[in-house]
Design a protein with these regions (language model features):
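Short hydrophobic "helix-edge" motifs at membrane interfaces and signal-peptide entry regions
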Residues: 10, 54-55, 296-297
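Phosphate/ribose-recognition catalytic cores of enzymes acting on nucleotide-derived substrates
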Residues: 257-317
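Ala/Thr-enriched low-complexity intrinsically disordered regions
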Residues: 14-16, 24-25, 29
Length: 317
């Protein structure tokens, strides 16, 4: 992978500005690019001995502004920021997009440099899943069986396994995740509590394109026509919020309205629309408390997810 890292200062600035805008000013600090677990642990041990707090942002790379918002939050709240770039094979099912998932290490390094990341961790698959590997971490029960778990039954086992491994290696004070992957964040929070990880899970707001489409590395798969229709997912969620603000409290009614809206989008095929408790992910017939309205929709072979969280008081709005 070394050839991807031999980029000039000008290349780093150009790549960063394409994502961040012209106000991006990549620093010339010594961001460490680490591949080995041994070197990572060495860097973490040094930071701990110096009394530094550690913020961690786990990603699969091909970074976008959503990822960068997590890095900025981590930079603001911690002395040392670690970002991992690893396309985790165990969270992909058969016939999913593991091989096609976008990768660009040079571009990612430019963006991390611009955000003053201290350590960029690029482990090899063989380092994290060596021959003979047989151990997995799994949150059991309805939380991982609903929503994305219905159509991706092994997905969250792969997510919790790799995140647990990374937590053990990085030992962060805080780990940062995006609200777009709301179910993932809830599952990881459950795992962290159950396994007594001494850290805080920080969930940051969804970052959207100008037309409302939630930022995702998979957006690059969309054809021009699909990209034109994809913002209707967010429009359907905004409509659902407006329904709640006007007093609607029926989960099925909100779900049907969203499905009707999305079915009007050319090429959209609904995987699920769900109205659930934001913490337990249990389906709600009547809205109360913290509510998550989530959806997954396919445009061709591209599967997009989005959600909105609403704090519904017992009294009518």
């Amino acid at each position: 992978m070394q050839r991807y890292w031999q980029n000039s200062s000008r290349q780093r600035r150009t790549a960063a500005r394409q994502i961040c805008g012209n106000d991006a000013t990549p620093s010339e600090t010594n961001m460490q690019i680490i591949q080995s677990k041994k070197e990572l642990r060495k860097g973490i041990k040094k930071a701990r001995s110096d009394g530094k707090t550690i913020g961690f942002v786990p990603t699969m790379g091909f970074l976008h502004r959503g990822h960068l918002s997590l890095m900025r939050r981590a930079r603001k709240e911690n002395d040392l920021v670690v970002v991992s770039i690893f396309v985790n094979p165990t969270q992909f099912g058969p016939n999913e997009d593991l091989d096609a998932y976008p990768r660009d290490a040079q571009r990612d390094i430019a963006l991390m440099t611009a955000e003053s990341v201290d350590i960029a961790f690029f482990p090899a698959v063989e380092a994290l899943y060596p021959e003979g590997y047989t151990t997995f971490v799994e949150v059991e029960g309805p939380m991982t069986e609903v929503l994305c778990g219905q159509s991706r039954p092994t997905h969250f086992r792969g997510v919790t396994t790799i995140v647990a491994k990374l937590f053990n290696m990085v030992a962060p004070d805080r780990a940062y995740f995006g609200q777009k992957d709301a179910q993932q964040a809830a599952v990881i929070r459950r795992m962290a509590v159950d396994l007594d990880f001494d850290l805080s899970i920080v969930v940051c707001p969804i970052v959207r394109e100008a037309d409302g489409l939630a930022m995702s590395s998979r957006n690059t798969y969309l054809s021009p026509e699909q990209r034109e229709n994809a913002p209707q997912l967010n429009q359907a969620l905004i409509m659902s919020r407006e329904m709640v603000e006007k007093g609607e409290r029926s989960g099925p009614a909100i779900r049907k309205a969203i499905e009707s809206k999305i079915n009007g989008a050319k090429g959209a095929v609904i995987d699920y629309v769900a109205v659930v408790n934001a913490e337990t992910l249990a389906e709600l017939q009547t809205l109360e408390g913290k509510v998550l309205i989530a959806l997954a929709v396919k445009f061709g072979t591209t599967r997009l997810i989005d959600n909105i969280q609403i704090d519904v008081r017992h009294q009518l709005a």
